[in-house]
Amino acid sequence: MSKKLIALCACPMGLAHTFMAAQALEEAAVEAGYEVKIETQGADGIQNRLTAQDIAEATIIIHSVAVTPEDNERFESRDVYEITLQDAIKNAAGIIKEIEEMIASEQQ
C-alpha cells in the first residue's frame, strides 16, 4: 500500500499564504515518499477538491488553516492533524516527520 498525504490549506484572504503552505507541504511530502493531493480554499474558491475516496485512502490528513474550511464535515470520521500556515511554510518536513512518529507510537 502506498503512502498518501492529503492536506487542506486555507487563510482568510486566500492569496499568498494558502498557496505557500500548499507548495511547502507538497514538496516535503513528495520528498518523504508520499503520493500527495492538496486542496486549497482561497480567493478563487476551492481548487483541487479532496474527494471522499481521497479522504478514505489517506495515510495522513493535514489541515493548514487560519479559517474554518468549507465542507469540513468531510473529515469527521478521520484523524486530522491541524497546523498553522506558518508551520507548514517554515517546517513542512519537520511536521510530517512528527506526524509519522505520532502514528508509529500509536500503533505500538
UniProtKB/Swiss-Prot annotation:
PROSITE patterns linked: PTS_EIIB_TYPE_2
Keywords: Cytoplasm, Kinase, Phosphoprotein, Phosphotransferase system, Sugar transport, Transferase, Transport
Pfam families: PTS_IIB (PF02302)
Residue ranges of every copy of the PTS EIIB type-2 domain listed in the record: 1-104
PTM-bearing positions, type Phosphocysteine: 11
Top-rank EC class of the record's enzyme: transferase
Listed GO CC annotations: cytoplasm
Catalysed reactions, semicolon-separated: D-fructose(out) + N(pros)-phospho-L-histidyl-[protein] = D-fructose 1-phosphate(in) + L-histidyl-[protein]
Presence of keyword Phosphoprotein: yes
EC number: 2.7.1.202
GO biological process: phosphoenolpyruvate-dependent sugar phosphotransferase system
InterPro entries according to UniProt: Bacterial_PTS_Sugar_Transport, PTS_EIIB-like_sf, PTS_EIIB_2, PTS_EIIB_2/3, PTS_IIB_fruc
SUPFAM superfamilies: PTS system IIB component-like
SS bonds (residue pairs): none
GO MF terms, alphabetically ordered: kinase activity; protein-N(PI)-phosphohistidine-fructose phosphotransferase system transporter activity; protein-phosphocysteine-D-fructose-phosphotransferase system transporter activity
Subcellular location: Cytoplasm
Active site: 11 (phosphocysteine intermediate)
Record remark on domains: The PTS EIIB type-2 domain is phosphorylated by phospho-EIIA on a cysteinyl residue. Then, it transfers the phosphoryl group to the sugar substrate concomitantly with the sugar uptake processed by the PTS EIIC type-2 domain.
NCBIfam families, A to Z: FRU
Function (record text): The phosphoenolpyruvate-dependent sugar phosphotransferase system (sugar PTS), a major carbohydrate active transport system, catalyzes the phosphorylation of incoming sugar substrates concomitantly with their translocation across the cell membrane. The enzyme II FryABC PTS system is involved in fructose transport.
Official protein name in the record: PTS system fructose-like EIIB component 1
Gene this chain is encoded by: fryB
